[in-house]
A protein has these predicted regions:
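Exposed, low-structure sequence patches enriched in small/polar residues
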Residues: 1-445
Length: 445
């Protein structure tokens, strides 16, 4: 009998249909070792690696009233890897992975960062520092009754304490949990809201084709790449002890996590898109972003914020006669012509344009944006905050695109950006200008 699915069919199927169809678990490595399917030698140090990814994505669209559209989305992704040194006694195993989950961090979303006069004071950071000892006591209580004698107390600045306190302070739905990787029931949605009903109001309808209000919110909690402690000893579940170089034991979870972060963005917090009756488009937006990075290595919270004000305008001139070729835009001729004559001329122009199949459109765009960003380093041990970087930037962009033919597009642009640093020690004001003309040739049209 020939081989089927890579199996030896002379006696029993090996290495098994479960492996062929990807249905085996982590225990398969031990099975393969016991059956002699793996090369066990001190000269071969290549471990057996397994990985698993859990990716949950939820989306929903709501329309509670006419012209009001709400898009909800929630994601949770957990990646876990396992590396087994099966060639050594006891099969030493290393675990690693990463984790991301959408959440809501509105409690301090619009909170200011403070300034130099008040020491960059942050009420949320003060609340976080006040919770550290309470969470340390709760973690320490989990080790009561342990048979391990003379163990060190729980480290107040370890991941087991700081991460739960961090989530409880800056996110919603934590409920005082001690979980480093929040469970599925703590998954919270992000949203995008769009309302277009203003264009139906009498005065607005007379001047605008459309008016849309926009709002979007996104917040993601992330655990960077982590790995298990090589000297970790299990006590109960994910609780255990890490053996130090001097032989002492310190209560700790299995994983060595150096950083976690919360990335939050209002993009925009409030935005208005308008289209006038003459096809002039305008956009006004206010955006904010915030990144909170908790470092267990430096025992700091690095907080960075940016605020953007954006104004944009665009206008399209159809069939614009720039170089005196092609059918120009229609103009009203001097002299007395009847309505029938005008209709004949318009019909003739339409037919001419249709025959050529080319509209020499001129698209213009003007964007003005102002951004202020700053980064603050907050020391958890001392409670002191200091500015580390920041700047303000004003950018003006002007662009015009002209369609020469179905394959050629002429573009002219001008960009000007002025940067002013927040700290005089970090640099000096700079201004950059870019301008030019480009000709784009496309074969796909």
């Amino acid at each position: 009998v020939g081989d089927v699915f890579g199996q030896r069919t002379g006696s029993v199927m090996a290495p098994g249909l479960g492996l062929a169809f990807g249905l085996t678990g982590d225990e398969y490595i031990e099975t393969a070792r016991n059956n002699g399917w793996l090369l066990c030698s001190d000269d071969v140090a290549t471990p057996a690696n397994t990985s698993a990814t859990e990716d949950l994505q939820l989306r929903a669209t709501l329309e509670p009233v006419r012209d009001l559209k709400i898009d909800l989305s929630a994601t949770r992704t957990a990646t876990k890897s396992r590396s087994v040194q099966f060639m050594y006694e006891g099969s030493p195993t290393t675990y690693s992975g990463s984790f991301t989950m959408t959440t809501i961090s509105l409690r301090s979303a619009l909170e200011g960062m403070g300034d130099a006069n008040n020491g960059y004071n942050s009420p949320s950071f003060n609340e976080f520092c006040g919770k550290v000892n309470a969470f340390r006591d709760r973690v320490q209580a989990q080790y009561e009754g342990s048979s391990v004698q003379d163990a060190n107390p729980v480290n107040a600045y370890g991941a087991d304490v700081l991460i739960p306190a961090f989530l409880d302070t800056y996110t919603m739905g934590a409920g005082g949990s001690l979980d480093i990787f929040p469970v599925l029931t703590r998954l919270l949605p992000n949203w995008s809201i769009r309302y277009g009903g203003l264009a139906k109001m009498p005065w607005i309808r007379d001047h605008f084709k459309s008016v849309n209000l926009n709002h979007s919110y996104k917040s993601v909690y992330s655990v960077g790449s982590y790995a298990s402690y090589s000297s970790w000893m299990e006590y109960m579940g994910d609780l255990g002890y890490v053996k130090a170089a001097d032989g002492s034991l310190t209560p700790s979870s299995r994983y060595n996590i150096s950083t976690v972060s919360i990335n939050e963005a209002f993009s925009p917090l409030l935005g208005v898109d308008m289209t006038f009756n003459n096809n002039l488009t305008c956009k006004v937006e206010y955006r904010t972003t915030r990144v909170l990075n908790l470092s267990m290595t430096s025992v700091h919270i690095n907080e960075s914020q940016s605020k953007d004000w954006v104004i944009g305008m665009g206008y399209k001139i159809s069939n614009f006669n720039l170089f005196g070729s092609g059918s120009g835009s229609s103009r009203k001729a001097a002299g007395g012509k009847g309505r029938n004559d005008d209709n004949k001329n318009n019909s003739s122009k339409t037919q001419t344009t249709s025959k050529k199949g080319i509209n020499h459109d001129l698209n213009t765009r003007l964007d003005v944006s102002f951004r202020r960003q700053a980064a603050i380093t907050r020391d958890i041990a001392s409670g002191v905050s200091s500015a580390s970087s920041g700047n303000s930037a004003l950018k003006i962009s002007l662009q015009a695109d002209y369609t020469l033919s179905r394959m050629l597009t002429l573009t002219a642009y001008y960009d000007r950006q002025t940067n002013t640093p927040l700290l005089s020690s970090s640099g000096y004001p700079t201004t950059t200008q870019d301008f030019g003309v480009s000709l784009k040739f496309s074969l796909t049209r």
